[in-house]
C-alpha cells in the first residue's frame, strides 16, 4: 500500500465513531464499550438476547433526529434467525414516535435507516472465518461502519466438537482462528462487537483470568481466544412472573440484564426491560 493510501485508511479508521454511549441504561456510567472492545450477550434461551441486539441495532441506524447514532452496522447471522419484518417494525415504530411529519416521508427515512445495515449469513465456523476475512474490505472502506453484531458466536459449538473428535484442541481450532482474526480486526479498524452466546452448562476445574461471570454456572465455556477478547458481559435472565398486580402486569414478561466488565473497573449494573411491539422498553 502506498503512503497516501495508508494515510487514507488511517484517517478513515480514526473517524470511526466510539459507541460508549450506545445504551447508557445497560452499562455503568461512562462504562460502555470503547473502540476495539467486545460485549458478550449471554444467557439461556428466551431471555431477550436477540431482542436486545435489535434494540442496539436500531439505536445505531436511526437518524440523530430520532435519538439514534446514525452509524452503519454489520449483522452476522449464524442462526438464520434474523427477523427482518420484526426489525423493520421496530424501526418504523421508533421513527413514528420520534419524528414530526415535516421530517420527511416515513418510507424515505426508513429506507435511509436500512441502508446502514449490512447482513451476512454463515452456516459453519469455516464460513464464519471466511466471512470475517471478507468483512475486512468493508471495515477499511466504510468509516461509518462502527458496529459488528454476531448472533450467535456459539452457534457451531456442538458441530465443532463433533468434527474435532477426541482432540480438545481440534474441537476449538475453528473458533480460535475466528477469534484471532477478529482480534486483529478490532485492533486495526477500531470497531465494536456485540455477540450473543447461548448458555451451556459445563463444569470447570478453575477460573481463567478473563472469567467475570456472576455465578459458577454462567462461566464462559468457549475457547480461551474468544474469552480473552471479551471486555464486557451482559448476562440475560427472565424474571419469574408475580401473582399480584393487574392482568397486564402479570402477562408482561420482565427480563433482567446484569452487566459486568473485565476492563479493570469494579462497576456493575443491573437493568430490566420488557418487549413490546415497538421493541425493548426499559423499566
Where are the language model's segments positioned?
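Generic enzyme active-site microenvironment
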Residues: 38, 149, 195-196
Amino acid at each position: 500500500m502506498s503512503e497516501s493510501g495508508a494515510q487514507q485508511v488511517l484517517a478513515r479508521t480514526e473517524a470511526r465513531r466510539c459507541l460508549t454511549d450506545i445504551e447508557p441504561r445497560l452499562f455503568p456510567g461512562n462504562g460502555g464499550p470503547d473502540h476495539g472492545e467486545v460485549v458478550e450477550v449471554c444467557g439461556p434461551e428466551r431471555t431477550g438476547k436477540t431482542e436486545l441486539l435489535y434494540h442496539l441495532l436500531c439505536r445505531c441506524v436511526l437518524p440523530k433526529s430520532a435519538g439514534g447514532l446514525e452509524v452503519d452496522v454489520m449483522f452476522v447471522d449464524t442462526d438464520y434467525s434474523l427477523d427482518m419484518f420484526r426489525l423493520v417494525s421496530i424501526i418504523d415504530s421508533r421513527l413514528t414516535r420520534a419524528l414530526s411529519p415535516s421530517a420527511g416521508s416515513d418510507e424515505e427515512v426508513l429506507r435511509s435507516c436500512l441502508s446502514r445495515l449490512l447482513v451476512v449469513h454463515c452456516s459453519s465456523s469455516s464460513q464464519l472465518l471466511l466471512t470475517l476475512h471478507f468483512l475486512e474490505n468493508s471495515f477499511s472502506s466504510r468509516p461509518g461502519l462502527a458496529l459488528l453484531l454476531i448472533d450467535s458466536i456459539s452457534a457451531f459449538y456442538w458441530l465443532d466438537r463433533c468434527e474435532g473428535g477426541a482432540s480438545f484442541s481440534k474441537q476449538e481450532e475453528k473458533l480460535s482462528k475466528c477469534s484471532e482474526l477478529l482480534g486483529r480486526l478490532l485492533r486495526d479498524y477500531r470497531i465494536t462487537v456485540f455477540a450473543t452466546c447461548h448458555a451451556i452448562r459445563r463444569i470447570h476445574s478453575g477460573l481463567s483470568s478473563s472469567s467475570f461471570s456472576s455465578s459458577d454456572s454462567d462461566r464462559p465455556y468457549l475457547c480461551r481466544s474468544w474469552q480473552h477478547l471479551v471486555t464486557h458481559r451482559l448476562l440475560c435472565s427472565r424474571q419469574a412472573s408475580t401473582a399480584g398486580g393487574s392482568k397486564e402486569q402479570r402477562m408482561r414478561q420482565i427480563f433482567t440484564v446484569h452487566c459486568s466488565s473485565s476492563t479493570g473497573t469494579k462497576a456493575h449494573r443491573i437493568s430490566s426491560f420488557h418487549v413490546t411491539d415497538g421493541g425493548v422498553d426499559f423499566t
